[in-house]
Amino acid sequence: METIVLPVINLAPIMPEIILSVFGMALLLVNVFVPSEQKAYLGYLSLVGIIAAGVSIVGGWGVPLDSFSGSVVQDNFALFFKGIFLLSAGLTILISDHYMKREGCNQGELYPLILFATMGMMLMASGTDLMTVFLGLEVLSVSLYVLAGFNRANLKSNEAGLKYFLLGAFSTGFLLYGMALTYGATGTTKIPKIAEFVAANGMVAQSPMFYIGMLLMASGFAFKIAAAPFHMWTPDVYEGAPTPMTAFMSAGPKAAGFAAFMRVLIVAFPTLKADWSDLLWVLAVLTMTIGNLIALNQDNIKRMLAYSSIAHAGYALVGFTAGNAEGAAGILFYMLSYAFMNIGAFAIIILVGKKGEENNNVADYAGFATKHPVLALAMAIFLFSLAGMPPTAGFIGKFYLFSGAIKAGYIWLAIIGVLNSAASVYYYLRVMVYMYMKNPTEEFDWMTLSPAVMLCILIAVVGVIIPGVVPSYLLELAQKAVLL
Amino acid sequence: MSQFPLISVMTFLPLLGVVLLFFVPKQSHSVHRMLALLVSLVTFVVSIPLVTGFQSNADFQFVEKMPWIAAGPFQMNYHVAIDGISLWLVLLTTFIMPIAILSTWTAVEEKVKEYMICLLLLEVGMLGAFVSLDLFLFYIFWEVMLIPMYFIIGIWGGKNKIYAAVKFFIYTMVGSMLMLVALVTLYFKAGAGDFNVLRFYEVTLDPATQVWMFLAFALAFAIKVPMFPLHTWLPDAHTEAPTAGSVILAAVLLKMGTYGFVRFAMPLFPDATDKFTPLIATLSVIGIIYAALVAMVQEDVKKLVAYSSVAHLGYVMLGVFALNLQGLSGGMLQMLNHGVSTGALFLIVGFIYERRHTRLITDFGGLAKQMPVFATIFMIVTLSSIGLPGTNGFVGEFLVLLGAFESELRWYAVIGTSGVILAAVYMLWMFQRVMFGELTNPKNQTLCDLNAREVGIMLPLLVLIFVMGVYPTPFIEKMSPSLEKLIVHVKTKQQGAVAQVETVPAAPQVMPAAAVVPAEHK
Amino acid sequence: MVSLHSYLIVSAILFSIGTIGVLVRRNAIVIFMCVEMMLNAVNLTFIALSRHLGNIDGQIFVFFVMTVAAAEAAVGLALMIAFYKNRESIDVEDVKLMKL
Amino acid sequence: MGYELFGLPMIYYISMVAKVLVVFVFVLLTVAYATYAERKIIGHMQVRLGPMRTGWHGLLQPIADGLKLFFKEEIVPSQADKFAFLIAPIIALVPAFIGFAVIPFGETIEVAGYKIPLQIAGYYDTVSGQVVDMNVGVLYILALASIGVYGIVLAGWSSNSKYSLLGGLRSSAQMISYELAAGLAIISVFMLSESLSLQKIVADQANGAWYCFKQPLAFILFFICSLAEINRTPFDLPEAETELVSGFCTEYSSMKYAMFFMAEYANMVTVCAVTTTLFLGGWHGPAFLPGWAWFIAKVYFLIFVCMWIRATYPRYRYDQLMRLGWKVFLPLTLVNIIVTGIVVSLQS
Amino acid sequence: MLGVYLPIIVLVAVAVIFGLASLTFSSLIGQKKPSAVKLAPYECGCEPVGSARERFSVKFYIIAMLFILFDIEAVFMYPWSVLFKRLGIFGVVEMGLFIVILFVGYIYVWKKGALEWE
């Protein structure tokens, strides 16, 4: 009976994941043992977990490691994304308490689920094995299905959860089938090994099975990042889900989708770059255009932001299509700033809403600036950043994305991108028109300015403005984090 | 770099005002007004040493340069300086700002704090755009200007303000976004380095690329100018904006477009400039005639003035694209003139609008009897706008037409001249309908004349109208070297390109010829 | 012995049936069962390929897929129950509160 | 016997058919007489005689019961889902009978020079000289147990009767709950045997002590869980006459009803056989008796224990039952696994 | 392979044939006198009220979900149990962690009251 020799396992690369899991589980247990009036502490505890995980990733910067026989890695790319995930999770937690209390939801499970979802995202970013990526994706997705339908008493939330679940599971099927075929064609599920195999076997490796596998995987990922034509779920889910979760979904998981998508395409299929660039070109154009065009006539602000988030995925795809370091760094930077600006915008949407009546209609914002000038200013900053106006992080991000495309010679793509971005200004301005240029119809006296939400807004404003004015440091980080 | 960062101080001084305003309580409107006025005056004072310290040569002066963003392939600097081209525009901006603030001293009653913040932010944007030598920095300021202007029109504007504001924003945005693409393309074509515009001047691009990039830049600038047929946002924006907005829009923002042509589009893409000169000249002339004709039938005084702006800027474009010293300096001067006289016109429209809350020509008539001071001032400004000799308008238009006549744009100049006559027709006709005749409307009989503040606002403008009309030399003197340098640069590169295309031995012949050009004007 | 191709073809057919089922059926539970069928088709593919390649990775993958499918099933059922409680239906035609 | 088919000698096929028939008839007879034995044993335990009329001491009673059921009227409720109603008893019955396929019930015998292991799903591989059986035999049995649930759920649902439905649901909830605990309980056995092959497990016990001594906790847990899984008293809630009439089979009559009963008793036999194999050393025993005899003896003893329990213990309440399964047995099995793991790795 | 699975197929066939045959046989020889009352569902002799195809307690769903989850966890333990001796102490620690995590969920479910039947 021979002993099985196991590979040396280094836990350092998955330290943040471990911390989050431990905190998540601890919170679950704490949740069932503390009386319901003390559940607010769960939020603080989960923030501690987020910060602890954040601390654990700092030391890993610039120290490439891999573990579990190459199933997970710790590289700058993964770490940068982990930072984005932690950030969006932290901001989401800040805005959750207020909302959930108002809607009368039981928050006990909320925080563990957010932590688990974040853990899943991290796994997606650091996984270098299709299996790890898949597992991360599913940990994320399953948590999100619940989070989307978290407000059980609310019909829209139910619908959002169900819809997200059905379509999400459906897309998982495609992703998996793609992974299976890729595995069949190359004989491995390790992403770097796939690349090695293709490099070694050249055209022989590029069987129909291989191409179909890549295509199916791409469509699976495209669903997760809500790229057209796989975006149909986004508006309904974003509209129906509890607002903090909408904020979370649009920031974290989308970035995670990009992380996995980028790693798979860039690392595993570098030799097929011409093929997937063409594919992404089409995806990017469709995604930007469809997202923007439909967003133009949305009255519901959550829905409008949902379509805008589709459009933003399109901009990020522009950088991806470029397939060069600028484009990739642009995606990293953009995802980071998108987390700030989008969650910030949602934080204000949460403040404006009241129980049962979320005031999500654009017209509900009439005269908001008169009543709450500072909040309106913050909202304006977020919206300008989303629209890509300087001097905000949104502009720098877009600049990088489009620069990448231009450098790679995709000038037309960049032009379509900027035209889209100009069109998108219309619907962002619309909100501002209501906030600043219409007379108030409401007193907005139901609003309670919860300190946690205000803190979130403050962080978001700083996170939008500072990188917009002095982006060097962050861009530098993003540059160092790209896989290319 | 050890010298005093005069430009930065000037540019960001209004920002300091913004910060201060944040801390002033919401209700103390008079404090807001005073503070904003004070800041803008100080800014103006700070900008005066730029003129006095300016050496009349072609160099960039008061240079400040420090690294700003450095990441990946990009290197952006905070690089500001002025030369003869931007000097006067900067001065015009700092000069117009206090006037603009004063102009809506009483007209804006609501959200005064926000209003003043917007105005001051706008000033930062405009000054920044004029002084930037780094294309990226320029772009940032260019876009930043949009936001406060959008709010000024949208919040404090007239009935149709939202439509006008959004239209203004989106028009400008579309153009500038394409410019961004071209800008990045240019950067990559130029190879490693920074966004310094002077560096880009030296880059030689193949004519086909130039065409595309010129189009992208030109679109952005042409929208801003605005050139026919991209001008449709302007009448709306002007009509709906509060007086200060209109004044700034006319006096400074539109110059941003023409300035863009002079500073960027032409020197960067000389071959394309050459190629597109006929087209632009055609559009300018169409603009002159068309705008004049449309102005003639306007019912609304403010709209009429807005269309006259379109016509005036047609002259500027014509002069600029004549690409000789007369034309260019005429164009530059016309920019200043237009800033002064159209700004003044908008102020005047603002005065009567404040009194009567209408701008329809038919609502007035015979005001001269009731308001003699007003009538006098209005007359002077109208004449200046028409370009009567002795006023500033004349010098500019004359130089433009002269320059155009001397260049290959001769026939355009001929047609453009008719615009002068048309301008006289519609301006005077309007003046006559408003000021003379029977004082029929009873509401007009109680109108009171301009008060001290209003006269005080107008006085500096009137002074300038005459000074620039009678003694324009100092203005031209300071800008000429820079303009000459520009002309040489553009022409050399145009011919250089031709030489490259043609036979190689032709090149040495061209070089001395290019060197001769400035000598002619000395 | 049955060849790899037969397995792949069977799993492709299963996958297609699942896909079509998802697209044409209206009952949420049936849709979910179709999704499960797709996952199982994938599992079959993995097993067949794993056997063909003599590489254990595919089988390990199947373990994870099964686990995930179970978790999804649990969550999915819970969501459907919540939906049914509020709406007395699990027909996806009724999932239409938020349409354009 | 030189002929071969698909690489196997003809005698393999002959012996296979023989084994199948013998086992099937054996199970059938055991099932039939288990019903008789149950009535008799419980009768005697309760100091009465049980069936006495048909045959000597009522020995023909099962046959009489069977015949009676054959002649009964078939009733299919008008609102029932006909197909599901019809198929349900078969789904319940078949897994109960085929579980025996993987259980080794005796030592390898030799017929005409060909070695035949006494296990249906097994054969002697002449190349390696070993008995080849299903290497995941235990999983097979667990899988069958799961399939059996479908029969019951379908029966309950298709009858369109509230008692049936509730009975079916309760029964399936109970079955899956205890299936879980049972499945976890036997993991500690595999940790000792390092195999899921029942042949291997039996062989392992022959070399050392029976697993019921090495894993007493697992043994008890498994046996109790199995009883619950097959709805034996004291866990026969689904058919609790006092609460739910006849549970899932309320609407059934005639042979269909009989088939549920056959399934239940067949399950009992299978469970006892599995327990024997996993914990009681299978067919091994002192050599004075042949292996199959030891096997039958052990199985019959366990069947007797089942009946004994029925006669002794009162029925559980449903909430007690579920609580017992989830809150006591489940954690116990997990603890057992960990303790076994620690002890075993400390020993080596 | 075949040697192991063929007998099972045969056994299944025998069992199915037995089942079908006895069903057919009994339905052939059994009497048939259906009536509306006889075909109605049994409700202690009362008239049946409403349909039986209605909602039932959510408890059953929860048990079903819990079963799926724990059963799948068990799936991971089976391969481990066969190999655990060869994995050495590491294997025990790993499975210990696994079971601890399982226990976290278990305690959560317990405290949430999913295991209570009232």
Curated annotation (Swiss-Prot), chain C:
Q: Which UniProt keywords apply?
A: Cell inner membrane, Cell membrane, Membrane, NAD, Quinone, Translocase, Transmembrane, Transmembrane helix, Transport, Ubiquinone
Q: Does the keyword Cell inner membrane apply?
A: yes
Quaternary data: NDH-1 is composed of 14 different subunits. Subunits NuoA, H, J, K, L, M, N constitute the membrane sector of the complex.
In which compartments does the protein localize? Cell inner membrane
Report the membrane topology from the UniProt record: Multi-pass membrane protein
- The name on file for this protein is NADH-quinone oxidoreductase subunit K 1
Major location (coarse): membrane
Q: Name one Pfam family in it.
A: Oxidored_q2
**GO cellular component annotations of the record:** NADH dehydrogenase complex; plasma membrane
What EC designation does it have?
7.1.1.-
The Gene Ontology terms for molecular function here are:
NADH:ubiquinone reductase (non-electrogenic) activity; quinone binding
EC category: translocase
The family note in this entry says: Belongs to the complex I subunit 4L family.
Is the keyword Cell membrane assigned to this protein? yes
GO terms in the biological process aspect are: ATP synthesis coupled electron transport
Q: What does this protein do?
A: NDH-1 shuttles electrons from NADH, via FMN and iron-sulfur (Fe-S) centers, to quinones in the respiratory chain. The immediate electron acceptor for the enzyme in this species is believed to be ubiquinone. Couples the redox reaction to proton translocation (for every two electrons transferred, four hydrogen ions are translocated across the cytoplasmic membrane), and thus conserves the redox energy in a proton gradient.
UniProtKB/Swiss-Prot annotation, chain D:
Q: Report the EC code(s) recorded for this entry.
A: 7.1.1.-
Q: How does it assemble?
A: NDH-1 is composed of 14 different subunits. Subunits NuoA, H, J, K, L, M, N constitute the membrane sector of the complex.
Q: Name one GO biological process term.
A: aerobic respiration
Gene Ontology cellular-component terms listed: plasma membrane; respiratory chain complex I
- Top-level taxonomy: Bacteria, Pseudomonadati, Thermodesulfobacteriota, Desulfuromonadia, Geobacterales
Q: Which UniProt keywords apply?
A: Cell inner membrane, Cell membrane, Membrane, NAD, Quinone, Translocase, Transmembrane, Transmembrane helix, Ubiquinone
From the UniProt record, list the reaction(s) this protein catalyses.
a quinone + NADH + 5 H(+)(in) = a quinol + NAD(+) + 4 H(+)(out)
Recorded family membership? Belongs to the complex I subunit 1 family.
Q: What is known about what this protein does?
A: NDH-1 shuttles electrons from NADH, via FMN and iron-sulfur (Fe-S) centers, to quinones in the respiratory chain. The immediate electron acceptor for the enzyme in this species is believed to be ubiquinone. Couples the redox reaction to proton translocation (for every two electrons transferred, four hydrogen ions are translocated across the cytoplasmic membrane), and thus conserves the redox energy in a proton gradient. This subunit may bind ubiquinone.
What Gene Ontology terms describe what this protein does at the molecular function level? oxidoreductase activity, acting on NAD(P)H, quinone or similar compound as acceptor; quinone binding
Q: Where located?
A: Cell inner membrane
Record has Cell inner membrane as a keyword: yes
Gene name of this polypeptide: nuoH1
Q: What is this protein called?
A: NADH-quinone oxidoreductase subunit H 1
Swiss-Prot record, chain E:
How does the entry describe its membrane topology? Multi-pass membrane protein
Q: What EC number(s) is this enzyme filed under? A: 7.1.1.-
List residues traversing the bilayer: 1-21, 60-80, 87-107
UniProt-annotated location(s): Cell inner membrane
Catalyses: a quinone + NADH + 5 H(+)(in) = a quinol + NAD(+) + 4 H(+)(out)
Query: Transmembrane helix as a keyword?
Result: yes
User: Which GO-annotated molecular functions does the record name?
Assistant: NADH dehydrogenase (ubiquinone) activity; NADH:ubiquinone reductase (non-electrogenic) activity; quinone binding
Where is the signal peptide, in residue numbers?
A: none
Q: What is its main location?
A: membrane
Q: What class of enzyme is it?
A: translocase
Mind listing the UniProt keywords for this protein, alphabetically? Answer: Cell inner membrane, Cell membrane, Membrane, NAD, Quinone, Translocase, Transmembrane, Transmembrane helix, Transport, Ubiquinone
Q: Which Gene3D superfamilies match?
A: NADH:ubiquinone/plastoquinone oxidoreductase, chain 3
Q: Transmembrane as a keyword?
A: yes
- What are the record's GO terms for cellular component? NADH dehydrogenase complex; plasma membrane
Q: Where are the annotated coiled coils located? A: none
Question: Quaternary arrangement and interactors, per the entry?
Answer: NDH-1 is composed of 14 different subunits. Subunits NuoA, H, J, K, L, M, N constitute the membrane sector of the complex.
- Please state which protein family the record places this protein in: Belongs to the complex I subunit 3 family.
User: Cross-referenced HAMAP family, in alphabetical order?
Assistant: NDH1_NuoA (MF_01394)
Biological role stated in the UniProt entry: NDH-1 shuttles electrons from NADH, via FMN and iron-sulfur (Fe-S) centers, to quinones in the respiratory chain. The immediate electron acceptor for the enzyme in this species is believed to be ubiquinone. Couples the redox reaction to proton translocation (for every two electrons transferred, four hydrogen ions are translocated across the cytoplasmic membrane), and thus conserves the redox energy in a proton gradient.
Q: Name it.
A: NADH-quinone oxidoreductase subunit A 1
